[in-house]
Amino acid sequence: MSFAVARMTKLKADNLVGIGNHDQRKTTNHSNEDIDVSHSHLNYDLVAGRTDNFKTDIEAYINENKASKRAVRKDAVLVNEWIITSDKDFFEQLDEAETRKYFETAKQYFADNYGDENIRYAVVHMDEKTPHMHMGIVPFDDDKKLSAKRIFNREALQRIQEELPQYLKENGFDVQRGNKNKERKNLSVPEYKAMREELKKIETEKQETQAKLADTKKQLDEIKPRDTKKIASKPTLMNKNKVTVDKSDLADLEQRAVTSDAYNFEKIHLEVENHSLRNDLSEAKGRNYELRKENERLQKLVGTLQGIIRNVDEFLHKKLGINLPEKWLERAGLKEPSKKAPESSQERSEGHHEELDGPSL
């Protein structure tokens, strides 16, 4: 049986630009090598039309619907993004319509519990190795108060991990919840890479085991009929639908089954963790873009102020024969700081008082 995977990340205003560009595929150069741009046209949004620009549209929705008249804090969590998926084998058994229904069913669970209108985007990516959905929920309570801490607290997260797989199963999808692990934490990039290398080794061992299993099956198929009859003649082996194995082999098979389940769940978890790391990268790129824009704006403002100061200095010189103090021009970046010999304590004191008497630029 496959696992239902649901993982949440918190997004603030600064994160929404980069995440929006990634989720909506607004950029052509992707750092994610798993993206196949030839399949990007297969992506879709289950609530299409609600959000075009993640940052401006979501902020507008919050401001229009929040109960309080006070401005939202700059560091407030505006969206809780859920990544919903399962393992690759699970989706290979579904057709396009069934895959869409899987994500629609998961979305409906959150709509029933957290408000359909609060789901501002539910983008399904079909252009990566495993289909998955990025679903953004504005954490409004019933009183339209914004509080991610209260809406998605620890109890709520545990409830979702229990209820969502059951909800999906009740709607026809053969999935179960992952292993309970209260000690699980988000992996750092080095930890993630190390874990991925370990999984590669496990995958190799798994392939070797499968090859041995195929070889063993071939040998079993070649067993002579007289050997089969000899076994079948035993009282305990009258049922031809059953086979016997040694106890040691049985224990080994049971252990491999447990290991396989743990391996599959850990593999899915790492795939989702990988998406989270890519989200972090997208957030950083978005933040970097905003900082560059802010820097450009400030540079233009500085240039404007320098022009005003320069005009004032020229006006005073032309009309009154005086100039602005050199310290003012130095502070405005219109003149290189003069190099002077070290001042005496009295000169420093006088200069200090002189500076306090005039306006500061």
UniProtKB/Swiss-Prot annotation:
Residue numbers spanned by region Disordered: 331-361
Which GO biological-process labels does this protein carry? DNA recombination
**Transmembrane region(s):** none
InterPro entries, per the entry:
Mob_Pre
Q: Which residues bind DNA?
A: 44, 114
UniProt KW keywords = DNA-binding, Plasmid
Xref: Pfam families: Mob_Pre
Any GO MF annotation of the entry? DNA binding
Q: Indicate the family of this protein.
A: Belongs to the plasmid mobilization pre family.
Q: By what name is this protein known?
A: Plasmid recombination enzyme
Phylogenetic lineage: Bacteria, Bacillati, Bacillota, Bacilli, Lactobacillales
